[in-house]
């Protein structure tokens, strides 16, 4: 699994939250603008793969499949 994908998924467990907004998920990319832009691509791919669900207003939640992959039961 790509390191950035892992960090994005791990943020849900680390922050113990069911939903996170895109600005919080940007932290997975660090401080560099290019890395933060890549977070947008990763989040879009995770939605397309059924691991994240869009909740509106830039909020995202792990799906059941995403929870399993992230190691959250």
Regions found by a protein language model. Give the residues of each.
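Short amphipathic alpha-helical interaction segments
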Residues: 32-48
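Short loop/turn and capping residues at structural boundaries
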Residues: 23, 40, 56-58
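A short, conserved structural fragment
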Residues: 47-57
